């Protein structure tokens, strides 16, 4: 006597035949034994605690609206109408949409361009320092790290500059899940001391598309972030997506270093052959 209408597959045989019994069997509604994503107190809370431990964060949130929802929650947490936020020109559209929603004012930093490859690079420390000096009342600095093309900024330096100016540092880490588990890779947002980071587990962590983590540091109030998330997040959180996040987190925690060591070796081989 509850949703979803497919009744764990019995109510929609065609869907069951396409996805399989196990898949539709996991697609259930929030109920007390399964916890609730909007206010987790048991199994979802445990999954979030394990994720926070794996990513060395003060707290982690399971996100089922893609990293778009993670990025927007970061910005809405720290920005109010009229606040300035320093960010690169090559931000994801979710950043711009968040500014529309909260009324914050962007202060753009133009990234350098690699003329030979025709791609934008990371935020340069000098340019960030200029923006901070020119806009001392800005509330935060947002960094793409890495960019879509894998370019990293000097994240530790930018975090330190932001904090020295009394600003938060937010990181769109959509393409940087592997930074937390590989050896010899660029520094992760949490290791660099960032206040919040959005991590696309489905991009390089192995979870299902649309699943993501929002990570926060010790100086961000987890309860307030939960309130912001619940302003926009569905009240029918997908247990398929949440399960995939938890399983993929465990997989990386146990096997991440060896997986990404192999990936680095493959990338080095491909680079050598291409060159």
Regions found by a protein language model. Name each.
Residues 1-7, 60-61, 272-275:
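Generic preference for hydrophobic/aromatic residues in regular secondary structure cores
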Residues 1-24:
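N-terminal glycine-rich, Lys/His-bearing helix-loop that initiates the first secondary-structure elements
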Residues 15-18, 36-39, 54-57, 67-275:
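Conserved PLP-enzyme active-site core in the AAT-like
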Residues 21-69:
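Conserved N-terminal alpha-helix of the aminotransferase class I/II PLP-enzyme fold
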């Amino acid at each position: 006597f509850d949703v979803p209408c497919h009744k764990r597959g019995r109510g929609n045989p065609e869907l069951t035949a396409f996805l399989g019994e196990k898949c539709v069997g996991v697609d259930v509604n929030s109920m007390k034994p399964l916890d609730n994503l909007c206010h987790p107190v048991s199994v979802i809370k445990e999954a979030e605690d394990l994720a926070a431990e794996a990513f060395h964060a003060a707290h982690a949130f399971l996100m089922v609206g893609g990293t778009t929802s993670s990025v927007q929650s970061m910005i809405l947490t720290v920005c109010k109408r009229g606040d300035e936020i320093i960010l690169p020109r090559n931000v994801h559209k979710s950043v711009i949409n968040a500014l529309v929603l909260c009324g914050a004012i962007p202060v753009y930093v133009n990234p350098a361009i690699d003329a030979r490859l025709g791609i934008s690079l990371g935020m340069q420390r000098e340019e960030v320092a200029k923006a901070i000096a020119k806009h001392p009342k800005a509330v935060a600095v947002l960094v793409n790290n890495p960019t879509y093309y894998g370019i990293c900024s000097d994240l530790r330096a930018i975090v330190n500059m932001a904090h020295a100016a009394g600003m938060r540092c937010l990181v769109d880490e959509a393409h940087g899940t592997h930074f937390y588990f590989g050896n010899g890779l660029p520094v992760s947002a949490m290791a660099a001391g960032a206040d919040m980071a959005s991590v696309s587990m489905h991009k390089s962590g192995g979870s299902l598309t649309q699943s993501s983590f929002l990570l926060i540091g010790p100086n961000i109030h987890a309860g307030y972030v939960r309130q912001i998330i619940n302003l926009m997040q569905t009240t029918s959180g997908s247990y398929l997506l949440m399960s995939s996040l938890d399983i993929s987190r465990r997989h990386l925690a146990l096997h991440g270093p060896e997986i990404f060591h192999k990936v680095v070796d493959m990338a080095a081989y491909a680079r050598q052959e291409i060159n």
